[in-house]
Amino acid sequence: MGNKKALKEEAFLGSAEEGADFDQAMFPVMETFEINDPMPKKRNWGSFCTAVMAIHLILLTAGTTLLTLKVLSLQKWILEKYLDNETLAAEDRSFFSLQLASPETHLVPRTPGLQALQVQLTQVRTSQEQLLQQVDNLTRNPELFRIKGERGSPGIPGLQGPPGIKGEAGLQGPMGAPREPGATGAPGPQGEKGSKGDKGLIGPKGEHGTKGDKGDLGLPGSKGDMGMKGVTGVMGPPGAQGNKGDPGKPGLPGLAGSPGVKGDQGQPGLQGVPGTPGAAGPSGAKGEPGHPGPPGPTGPQGISGSPGAAGLKGSKGDTGIQGQKGTKGESGVPGLAGRKGDTGNPGLAGPKGEPGRPGLKGDPGMKGSSGQQGQKGEKGEKGQSFKEVRIVGGTNRGRAEIFYNNAWGTICDDNWDNNDATVFCRMLGYSSGKGFTFGGGSGNIWLDDVNCQGTEDSLWNCRKNNWGSHNCNHNEDAGVECR
């Protein structure tokens, strides 16, 4: 196919070159005709001019016919080469032929052969216009009829011709004879300071530096000074003893005694046998934060032991005798502030006072030293975990029941399928389940219209009606078979 197109293109270019040679041979003959030829002195000049005009018209007609044939052949060749659909209408083809004759042709401008052909067609058209203009000038020349006419107006400037093809590079000239070096010229003036150059490109990213050494551990902070204890006021003198009054109502609880001084820390004793839990004693004062000790080695995790038995409840003590109410003494004169006394012996523990308001959260204490690792306890007995669902009537097959509101109840079989049964069985430790109707239950019917996806961990996460809302009887109780 490509060879056929190449042969057609070469044949067309050959015909175009022959037409161009014919035009070049024809037009120089036409151009040699001079308008201002000297008039012969013969009397038959008019018939000679008529014959010349007839010859020119015949040649012009022949050239136009040849040009039309070339345009038609060019149109046919372009239709065969560049248009796959050959069903163009006649009016489209005539319009296309006019476009080919126009100097503003845009047919495949990127093909070198068509560009050369377009240049040749433009030259032919320009030569034809010049020929028509010369013939028109011959017919309108008054000197042919020995009548001097008026000077004509200047003609319209012609269209600008297409740019010529770039000529080949000329031969390199011979190298000139060497000359003696000229005298050294005077140094030129100092040039102006150049403008600041553009900012350079950002350099490549440097390599990561080595990781620095770990810093030394800081010293522990010093312990702050303890604040001064407030001075207790002087107690007033005791009043005279009054008459014994009637037994009064139980008095308010006494004030809590001051906490005793913290004793020195004893050495850790041997681990004793765990005894029964005693009664809760009063909370001691907050100890001073100890210095942080070195971290001890991490011991293996011991097995959780069984919870100890609950201790027996102690018996209620006897109510003490109500003391006599003394008269209120006069307020003494506040004495001078004395020196800070020595720490007294710890007093007896007073009755438990009412719980005070919760104090502000204290600052976190420093981490204490790690205690010695305790002995490994005995393995406790396995406890029974409470299940929120159960199977009644068999180990893994039976009626499905669920525990809610401190009571067991059944599930209605409306929309009960294998996905719901799988979630139910998963709550009992199985991997899958199968749902069906079992019936025979009693008591509450807790769930109805359960709609699980099969991926939930509990029936509480599934879509369902409200607890206790149903329209079923116990003959519709749901059953499961867990696997």
UniProtKB/Swiss-Prot annotation:
Domain SRCR: 389-483
Membrane-crossing segments per the record: 49-69
Gene Ontology biological-process entries: innate immune response
Disulfide bonds: 412-472, 425-482, 452-462
Compartments where found: Cell membrane
Biased composition (Basic and acidic residues): 193-216, 376-386
Side Extracellular, residues: 70-483
Residue ranges with Low complexity bias: 153-166, 273-286
Subunit structure: Homotrimer; disulfide-linked. Trimers may assemble in larger oligomers thus resulting in the creation of a large surface capable of interacting with very large ligands.
Listed name of the protein: Macrophage receptor MARCO
Expressed in which tissues: Expressed in alveolar macrophages, macrophages of lymph node sinues, and Kupffer cells in liver (at protein level).
Classification via PROSITE patterns: SRCR_1 (PS00420), SRCR_2 (PS50287)
Primary site of residence: membrane
Residues that carry a glycan: 85, 137
GO MF terms held by the record: G protein-coupled receptor binding
Origin: domain of life: Eukaryota
